[in-house]
């Protein structure tokens, strides 16, 4: 949009706002409650009326003479009909000539965006659409700002996120995405409770940030005069609860990570994290298959759904392969990768060479495990469209996971991928207090070497482990990324109601 066109648009909008303010000034003089009444009560929703009366004929409705009270926002004016939108859908209201005259006299006419209450008998138009005859009516809220002209939604993507309230009014797809999100949360919660998990709440502010490798947000507690951190993960508190005897716990809540913005990342995001005693990471993979197929079926009515140009299948058994196997599988023409052995994964010089050959910008403090993960992320992860568990994560990038009995370089850990992105991370928990102590110390050394995302040392958590953590498996599932898949959206901002935004210039 050129500056001239933009200025003209702003001037036109300001003119409309001034006209609407003038109308409201007149309404205040003649109407109760200073033009903002609060005594209208609706008794019906558009969606419910459609379900109950949508199949009835025009004659049947006239005979019924069923009177309803509806309320909502005016989205269109079509001759004598007003299209009214509320939470369940849309329905029309009919104003005969006498009512139209009254509306003009009382309210100086109604505008698109106004919120109105209507009471009257339910009828059906010649086209077969339900409508309510406007026998009683009241303007409940005068909209001072006009809505965007195009009903398919805002064309300015950034404005959709900054003014989500407008986006939700005019964009049905956006509203539906958040309805799906709400259903996903409910379905997950119900599933977990059905499996005898107890829902808990753990602190959002931590004295020591932990439970994940990430840079935290820092705040200050005035009364205690001490720094605190917004949590990056609830893991260490949830495992303390397992030590305390709660064998199955879960939490759905926000995490905060002081990192960049991208189509996959928002600094404030929602996770479902859960822990179950007397289980391992293989049990978790089976559990995840059951959970996700159940959620998809309950929310969408199917375990198969489109994502971009692909169709993803949440039902059945998911593919399983190690990270080492994945980079070999997805790099068939890379001679160095094809020649790799598991022993080579601990050869840092070789791993640096391979990482650079696939365009990874190597940091000097990266370990062999970090190099392997970066090679995987660059060459294999984007190709994992169907549900896939990737196992065989090295211990040096898994400081809270139990070491593999077969090879202590690896851990009993997996990450779950679908649609080319990670959605979940789970593992058999490290319950050896001495090993955990050593790994925390290694993380501190990494932080001192320049790794801002390395973990802090948590002495109280070590004390908890010394009291005895039973064999336990735990997992975190990214709710935002899961909802992206179930709504076929490709940016996390489309599934977060109010995403983080840079300040407007």
From Swiss-Prot:
Chief localization: cytoplasm
Residue sites binding Mg(2+) 1 per the record: 415, 422
Bound cofactor: record note: Binds 3 Mg(2+) ions per subunit.
EC id: 6.1.1.6
Cofactors (names): Mg(2+)
Key word Transferase present: no
Gene3D superfamilies listed in its UniProt record: Bira Bifunctional Protein, Domain 2, Nucleic acid-binding proteins
Intracellular or extracellular location(s): Cytoplasm
Sections of the chain in a coiled coil: none
Keyword Ligase applies: yes
GO cellular component, one term: cytosol
Catalytic activity: tRNA(Lys) + L-lysine + ATP = L-lysyl-tRNA(Lys) + AMP + diphosphate
Biological processes, Gene Ontology terms: lysyl-tRNA aminoacylation
Pfam families according to UniProt: tRNA-synt_2 (PF00152), tRNA_anti-codon (PF01336)
InterPro entries referenced in this protein's UniProt entry, alphabetically: Aa-tRNA-synt_II (IPR004364), aa-tRNA-synth_II (IPR006195), aa-tRNA-synth_II/BPL/LPL (IPR045864), Lys-tRNA-ligase_II (IPR002313), Lys-tRNA-ligase_II_N (IPR044136), Lys-tRNA-synth_II_C (IPR018149), NA-bd_OB-fold (IPR012340), NA-bd_OB_tRNA (IPR004365)
MF (Gene Ontology): ATP binding; lysine-tRNA ligase activity; magnesium ion binding; tRNA binding
Signal peptide residues on this chain, from the entry's feature table: none
Self-association and partners: Homodimer.
NCBIfam families found in the cross-reference section: lysS_bact, PRK00484.1
HAMAP family in the record: Lys_tRNA_synth_class2
Protein name: Lysine--tRNA ligase
Origin species: Vibrio parahaemolyticus serotype O3:K6 (strain RIMD 2210633)
Taxon lineage: Bacteria, Pseudomonadati, Pseudomonadota, Gammaproteobacteria, Vibrionales
Gene field: lysS
């Amino acid at each position: 949009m050129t500056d001239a066109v933009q200025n003209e648009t702003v001037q036109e909008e300001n003119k409309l706002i001034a006209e609407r303010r003038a109308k409201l000034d007149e309404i205040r003089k003649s109407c109760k409650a200073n033009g903002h009444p609060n005594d209208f009560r609706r008794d019906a929703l558009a969606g419910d009326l459609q379900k109950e009366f949508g199949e009835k004929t025009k004659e049947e409705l006239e005979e019924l003479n069923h009177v309803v009270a509806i309320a909502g926002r005016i989205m269109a004016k079509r001759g004598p009909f007003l299209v009214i939108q509320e939470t369940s859908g849309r329905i029309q209201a009919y104003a005969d000539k006498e009512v139209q005259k009254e509306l003009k006299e009382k309210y100086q006419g109604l505008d698109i965006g106004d919120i109105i209450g209507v009471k009257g008998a339910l009828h059906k138009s010649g086209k077969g659409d339900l409508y309510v005859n406007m026998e009683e009516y009241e303007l409940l809220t005068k909209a001072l700002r006009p809505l965007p002209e195009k009903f398919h939604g805002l064309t300015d993507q950034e404005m959709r996120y900054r003014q989500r309230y407008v986006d939700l009014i005019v964009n049905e797809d956006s509203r539906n995405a958040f309805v799906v999100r709400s259903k996903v949360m409910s379905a997950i919660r119900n599933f977990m409770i059905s499996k005898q998990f107890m829902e808990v709440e753990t602190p959002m502010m931590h004295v020591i940030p932990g439970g994940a490798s990430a840079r935290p947000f820092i705040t200050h507690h005035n009364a205690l005069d001490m720094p605190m951190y917004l949590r990056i993960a609830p893991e260490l508190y949830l495992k303390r609860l397992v030590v305390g005897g709660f064998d199955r716990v879960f939490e759905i809540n926000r995490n905060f990570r002081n990192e960049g913005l991208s189509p996959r990342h928002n600094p404030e995001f929602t996770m479902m994290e859960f822990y179950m005693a007397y289980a391992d990471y293989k049990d978790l993979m089976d559990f995840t298959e059951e959970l996700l197929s159940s959620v998809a079926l309950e929310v969408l009515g199917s375990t198969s759904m489109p994502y971009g140009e692909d169709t993803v299948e949440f039902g059945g058994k998911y593919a399983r392969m190690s990270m080492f196997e994945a980079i070999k599988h997805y790099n068939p023409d890379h001679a160095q990768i094809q020649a790799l052995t598991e022993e080579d994964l601990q050869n840092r010089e070789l791993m640096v060479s391979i990482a650079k050959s696939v365009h990874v910008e190597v940091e000097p403090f990266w370990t062999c495990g970090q190099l392997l993960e970066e090679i995987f992320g660059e060459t294999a992860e984007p190709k994992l469209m169907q549900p896939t568990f990737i196992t065989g994560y090295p211990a040096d990038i898994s400081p809270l996971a139990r070491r593999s009995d077969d090879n202590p370089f690896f851990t009993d850990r997996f990450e779950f991928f679908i649609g080319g992105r990670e959605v979940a991370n789970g593992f058999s928990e490290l319950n050896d207090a001495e090993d955990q102590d050593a790994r925390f110390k290694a993380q501190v050394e990494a932080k001192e070497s320049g790794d801002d995302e390395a973990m802090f040392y948590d002495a109280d958590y070590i004390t908890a482990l010394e009291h005895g953590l039973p064999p336990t498996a735990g997992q975190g599932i990214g709710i935002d990324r899961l909802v992206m898949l179930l709504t076929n959206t490709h940016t996390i901002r489309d599934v977060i109601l109010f995403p983080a935004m840079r300040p407007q210039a």
